[in-house]
Every structure is written in structure tokens, then in C-alpha cells.
């Protein structure tokens, strides 16, 4: 058992640099506290509506006792998602599935403790409820909406947005319609201006620990798999043997261009 504020002291030191600026650490403390308390308070409980009907069944490879970490089969679709119930013996885990937590012995600084103390008890609120404040170190240039990443729930505070200056179409064009394949293809294959599209070491040292800075292609990258490797990977992730994968066809994308149906 650990107190919330002690937990957060480690989280903001583990997720980002413990030597970041005070205001950045304070903002992260509020965001991380909001995510934690939203989940601990059970705001995620019983929201998931499982499909029903004669053409729907729970996949035989799914965990039968866990509705929040399961897999469903329909006549033409496989749906799999993961949530916090993938660990049932503790509230949150120590890695990116929840929040990076490297223990209370994690090296901290006076400025981290100051940020926690200055924001003690502060959370983000929307419509009277604590916000399920999801975050990432690099968004790829556009924020994604909650319903395309986790569950089919639309939160007004997790809306699509270009990660750049807004209001001036010359210096900050509007976010393209990345649900359209042609626009998404162009967006992904180029490197649009964005706050997180930077190689500035001073900026990166504010938000990344030293070991995270070893990665340099975090904004755009390329990974290649052989057909056998891809088939094995999908079998491992889904528990279903589809045989040899002949093609991967994009079917639906979220507002950031990320695939949610393939």
C-alpha cells in the first residue's frame, strides 16, 4: 500500500525527467493524479457494453472471467481490447499499461516534491467527474479520441486536435481529415510540424529521461516484418491462427489517422 502523493512523486519522475521545469511537472502531476483517481474510483466499471445476438460469441481464447480484457468473435470481425482488469491483485501496474512507476526509491528532486505539494489533491473535472486523463510522450502530430483507442465512449475533453499552434491557417493549418485513407497516407509518410516533432535536446531533456532519449525516431519510424514474422505476431497477440497473412487492408481510422479496424 502506498499513498497517492508518494506514488505520484515516483510517477512524474519516471514518466518524465525529474529535472524538468516546475510548471511542466505540476501539469503532469495533475494529469497523472486525475487518471489514477478516475480509475480507482470505479469510473471505468460497468461501462463496457458487450455485443449481443446470434452471430456473436465470446472467443474461445478469451479470459472467461474478465469482461474488461477479452476478445469477441462475430461473423466478420474480431475485437480485442485490454483494460486495467488485466491485473486483478493490485490497482495499477508499474509500466506503460498504467503509468510508469519505478518505486519510491526512484531518484527524485526537490522540484518534483515541490510540484506534488503545490498541486496536492488537484484533479481535472468534466461534468462533475474526474477526467480519465490519458497522455503520451509523442502523439505523432495529432491527438486521438478516446473511443478509437480504448472503449466506444466519447469524452468531450479528449477531442481531436493538431499538436501545434492553432488559429492561423498560414502558420498552423487545420488538422486534415485523417479518417480518409488518402489524407492519412500523406500525413503518415511525411513529417508535419508539431510540438512533439523536435530534435531540440533541451526540450527533449525536459520530458524524457536519459534512457528514453536513446530513441531518436519517435515521431516517425519504419518497421518491417516478413510474412512469417507477421503471422506469428498476430497469432501471439490474438490467440487465433489465421494462417499466412496475405494482405493488411485499412478499413477504419480514428481522427488522428490511427487504425482501429483492419
Which functions belong to the PLM regions below?
Residues 1-262:
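Conserved, single-site charged/polar hotspot
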Amino acid at each position: 500500500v502506498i499513498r497517492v502523493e508518494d506514488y505520484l512523486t515516483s510517477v512524474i519522475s519516471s514518466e518524465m525527467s525529474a529535472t524538468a521545469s516546475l510548471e511542466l511537472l505540476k501539469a503532469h502531476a495533475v494529469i497523472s493524479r486525475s487518471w489514477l483517481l478516475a480509475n480507482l474510483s470505479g469510473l471505468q466499471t460497468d461501462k463496457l457494453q458487450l455485443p449481443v445476438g446470434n452471430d456473436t460469441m465470446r472467443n474461445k481464447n478469451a479470459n472467461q472471467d474478465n469482461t474488461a480484457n477479452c476478445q469477441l468473435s462475430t461473423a466478420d470481425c474480431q475485437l480485442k481490447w485490454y483494460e486495467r482488469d488485466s491485473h486483478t491483485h493490485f490497482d495499477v501496474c508499474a509500466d506503460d499499461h498504467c503509468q510508469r512507476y519505478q518505486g519510491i526509491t526512484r531518484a527524485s528532486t526537490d522540484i518534483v516534491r515541490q510540484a506534488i505539494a503545490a498541486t496536492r489533491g488537484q484533479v481535472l473535472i468534466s461534468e462533475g467527474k474526474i477526467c480519465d486523463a490519458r497522455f503520451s510522450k509523442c502523439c505523432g502530430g495529432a491527438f486521438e479520441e478516446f473511443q478509437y483507442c480504448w472503449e466506444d465512449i466519447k469524452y468531450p475533453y479528449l477531442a481531436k486536435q493538431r499538436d501545434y499552434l492553432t488559429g492561423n491557417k498560414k502558420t498552423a493549418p487545420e488538422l486534415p481529415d485523417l479518417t480518409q485513407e488518402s489524407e492519412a497516407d500523406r500525413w503518415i509518410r511525411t513529417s508535419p510540424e508539431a510540438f512533439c516533432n523536435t530534435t531540440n535536446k533541451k526540450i527533449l531533456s525536459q520530458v524524457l529521461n536519459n534512457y528514453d532519449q536513446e530513441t531518436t525516431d519517435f515521431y516517425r519510424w519504419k518497421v518491417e516484418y516478413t510474412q512469417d514474422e507477421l503471422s506469428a505476431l498476430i497469432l501471439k497477440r490474438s490467440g487465433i491462427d489465421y494462417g499466412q497473412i496475405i494482405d493488411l487492408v485499412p478499413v477504419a481510422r480514428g481522427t488522428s489517422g490511427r487504425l482501429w479496424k483492419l
